[in-house]
Amino acid sequence: MGIASEALKNFKGFNLKSMPEVEPVSPGHRACQGCGEVLALRQAMKAIGTNTVVCSATGCMEIITSPYPQTAWRVPWIHVAFENAAAVVSGVEAAYKAMNRKKIIDQPGVTFIAYGGDGATADIGMQALSGALERGHNFVYFCFDNEAYMNTGIQRSSSTPFGASTTTSPAGSKSSGQATWKKNMAEIAVAHGTPYVATATPAYPIDLMNKVKKASLVPGPAYIHIYSPCPTGWRCGIDESIEVARLAVQSKVFPLYEVIDGEFHLSRKVAKPKPVSEYFKPQRRFRHLTEAEVQFIQDRVDVEYEKLVKKCVVEDKKKEKE
């Protein structure tokens, strides 16, 4: 039995009746209307609780929660550079470990969190994250993936999906938007031998919170890739964030799964998938795509999903009902 399996063998998850009341991230922040990322952040931090130290990369969640002299954070929180959240949390975790060992402090149960957007994770901060995972620091990393550099003007990242129009991959007469496929950061984390890796979305809050709680219980690094709708950048309605996130799962564009000690477990089997065209429809960043391009994307989604299913040693018995 691996270290994650051992840590989680008696795991008891959240449900609607046992939802924690604690709010480490307070209301009154400055997120855009309909922001899916801050909702995901709130859900994740409710699952973690208050005995934590958080290291935040520069990005949307840093900007909207910490305009000096105000803060939305009710826990120790450190703002660091775009690229080094994982490096900083490594140092914080090591410092706490040393101070506990030397009896300078008596705080053995602190959960160490680092987070960033897709740009800070998959691009600018990937080297620091890779190093932290390889060294085996005891921390949880959240990637809040809104599929572009939204904070600085909706520029494409390596997590921007194929065909999406951004300010640096604009659709036009000679371009169909983003020309490369989305980088699979969850599987990159798995390739590092990370004990616990998962995907989540705020459209399924209990699933997200249970995965975050599991990650916090595993000794060693854990990585959670959280799909985070951005109405501003995706050009969908401010009331459509959760519906778009749900459609991403139902269309197999963003599968929900977890990897425990290298074993893949599908969290939600999509028995009757919806076409990717239905997922694209609310988002004007995809409105330029032709039927042929949509079918091209559909074929790729189908292939990637089947690859994932074949990796899974256990599939959740629950079928997609929607």
Each language-model region and where it sits:
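Electropositive phosphate-/nucleotide-binding environments in soluble metabolic enzymes
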Residues: V22, G34-V38, F82-A86, A179, ...
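Conserved thiamine diphosphate
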Residues: N15-M19, G28, Q107-P108, S158-K214
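Short, conserved beta-strand edge motifs with alternating hydrophobic and charged residues
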Residues: C143, A198-A200, Y223-Y227
